[in-house]
Amino acid sequence: MTTISTTTASSSSSSRGRVFHRRTHQSRRRLLRTTEVVQAQTSSSNDAMEEETFDVVIIGSGIGGLSAAALLAKYDLKVCCVESHEHAGGAAHEWKRDGFTFESGPSLYTGLSQFPTSNPLGQILHAIDEPLKCIRYNTWKVHFPEATFVTEVGNDQFIECLEKYYDAEAVADWRKLKEKMEPLAQASAALPPAAVRTDAYAAWTLARFIPGLFQSMPSLNAILSDYESFLDKNDINSKFIRDYMDLLCFLLSGGTSKATMGAEIGYMFADWYAPNAALEFPIGGSGALVDCLVRGFEKYGGDLRLRTHCEEILVEKKDGEEEEATGIVTKTRDGKKKILRARKAVISNATIWDTEALLRDCAEGRRQSVREASSTTRTTKSGKIVDDDVEFCQSFMHLHLGIDAANLPAAETLEMHHVWVGDWDKGVDAEQNLVLVSIPSIKDPSMAPEGKHVIHAYTPGNEPLARWKNVKYNSEEYSKLKKERSEVLYQAVAKALNNITVEDLRSRAEIEMVGTPVTHARFLRRGNSQGTYGGTGWIKKKESGDDSAAAVPVTSAKSNLKNLLLVGDSRFPGPGLPAVAAGGWAAAHELVDFRRQCEVLDKVVAR
């Protein structure tokens, strides 16, 4: 699951060896965007804005943007990726302070280091020849209303937990679910995102997967529908198993089973509950993952520009044809502006709502179409049009701690990952009812100084945006609300540390940082999207009497504006590392020859 940065990351000005581009720009007059005026600007060197030209310009270095960037550079395109922050990685970046390494986002990883893998992000790492060193493990601890216990992935130990803490119905339903999930998991992996393209040449890239697709036909409807319908159809009635699957869906997609596509949970189930499956943790944290993508991008000639903000997406009409994206205007922290032209495409890793705001001189209808292209539409038998609009996910509260571990239990007796649920009846998406705790220094001691632990606790996408909408950053109201809303995080961390008191935990804290939806909006440039975790709403359980076909969103980077592609957590399939990496594959394969795509498929997909 990918979470969102909530800190300034100001503790380290290091950028892992990146070069900040601080070229001298000439002053500019008001930017006019028609082709004729851009040509006229060159008549005055004092008035003209400096320009550079690339094949592709990418806005934002989140995992979706970096995935597309690294793949396109691998395909020999000239690519520039601009990032407002001083660190690459977007919601997955990390920063250091006083020897502690803090992760802003992801905490649970699978399928990144082994080969073959069904994880689209793991496949990208293989494609660009950037292996990621990971620690493999298989346990996590849950703190549920009924019981607290350690459970495992990759075997049947969960059955033992069900037998000990729950009832016979839960055991029977879990056994049944594992059996029913096997064909769903196989169907979910039958067509990797790396094979998809939207032109006629898809016949070539998809050909090798046709046999697997035919074998998966009986499960096709299930992978394209909401997962709750799958549970209903297979008579999974145990309240705990239904609650538990809601939890897994929410951690995966930001929605419960009624709002999660069967294919998504199929991928996850294959990764977690296949024999000998394991969780992974990148040595060095999420920053090591980001570094792999950046190294791959740069070694193939990519140009990453940090501290470089996109002010605007340029939209022009050429020769009287339809509007198209032709480049961007950037602004560095010293106030200098530059035009970066794109021969083939502009790719935005900003949210669809924040991308819309960058289309300043685009026709109103075109601006709206950026958002509408991310929705799904279906038609009922009676001819009624039903729009399933993309919606905001809620946001996060985050707690980052660097603590003194003196007299705490030894690291080998503690678990790295903890999940706390307050009340199943409220629902896992209820505010303040679900907390995740990650203590990465338990598995990777390099994440904290000797004798210390680094901790990240967060409410994963269930903090209401509306509660923070009109709260001013650093106001008295903000400080009070931040303290109030972070209390549940302290309580969950205290439980994770073998039930120490909150007072003991606070006394151990050497570094303490609390993040809110407001810090999401500020540091991830999500002002128009209010600090959201990403998008949701593409998968909706049909209401009684709705005779429409299921709305089937497709992993596509296309927008309704020519040469503007969209990636990231506000596009289907939504938040999460595998999901946004799938968007990176989709964007890259809108722009490259199918024969090059087939070469990469030979490399990353096991036959």
Q: Which residue ranges define each predicted feature?
A:
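A glycine-rich dinucleotide-binding beta-alpha-beta segment and adjacent secondary-structure elements
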Residues: 241-257, 436, 498-573
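Short beta-strand to alpha-helix junction loop
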Residues: 215-226, 273-299, 305-307, 477-485
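N-terminal glycine-rich phosphate/pyrophosphate-binding loop and immediately adjacent elements
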Residues: 48-193
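A conserved FAD-binding loop/helix module that cradles the flavin
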Residues: 106, 569-592
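Rossmann-like flavin
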Residues: 145-260
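N-terminal chloroplast transit peptides
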Residues: 1-27
